[in-house]
Amino acid sequence: YSYSTLLALSDHIKDEMKQQGVLITDSTVSTDISEKVFQSAIPKTVTGRQLTSWRKGSQGRVNQSTKPSSRSQSIAVVGMAGQFPEAGDVEVFWENIAQGKNCISEIPKKRWDIDKYYQKGEAVAGKTYSKWMGALEGYDLFDPLFFNISPIEAESMDPQQRLFLEACWHTIEHAGYNPHVLSGSKCGVYVGCAYGDYQMLSREEQLSAQGFTGGSTSILPARISYFLNLQGPCISIDTACSSSLVAIANACDGLVSGSIDSALAGGINVMAGPDMHIKAAQSGMLSPDGKCHT
């Protein structure tokens, strides 16, 4: 929060790396630098330790020695996909970043009627003082039959589940693989997400079997694991704003430890209705002009 622009954050990272003794040049940072930083944070060996038995007051000692992992600590990102405000894929997203484009806009009417909830000035109960958001285009479009999901069930699925399914499929394709070849493999799925507000739009869906699974964050990563028969862990993580980074960190830990051979990791967040927007405004977390000033 102390660095409100990409340039300021970049300068901060450079300073931190210089303090660690890593040489930074004006050219693109090489993969050798990132590997040095990554390896410096991980002990090369794990020393054995003595554990005392607690059973029946036993004073016996258990010698537990852990051998250093023989697996490489280098991790390759071989595929990437995603949708973002005013960017339908990662290529356009990168162009927006490079150009410094502001992708925040007024809340579109097709998302919800902001005029019913907007009130300028101080926060008022049930109202929001901000009318801005980063809105995804076509977030409600989905081909359920492609994923062997019935249209009835798809209607009860939070858009976060649908979008993550699509993003995982496109990520594997982007890596140059047929997604179905991963069947039976130790591929883990890690996603940063939070409970959505989609089902609050329909009381009927809240009380249905489809709504029970369609709104569950634990089901969100399991969808792609089930569809592709992935045998690694499927874990949803909610640590607020850091959820996606924590998900990726967990995936890296799994790869280094050898518990998985590959991973799908990322994050998803969609506000389908006004509830979360209003709550955030009530907490004073939103900007009245749609721009960050911290």
Regions found by a protein language model. Name each.
Residues R162-H180, S236-N269:
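Active-site-proximal alpha-helical scaffold in enzymes
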Residues E106-I107, S218-S225, V246-G254, S262, ...:
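Glycine-/small-residue-rich "gating" segment that lines the acyl/pantetheine channel
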Residues Y1-S58:
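Phosphopantetheine-dependent thiolation modules in NRPS/PKS and related acyl-activating systems
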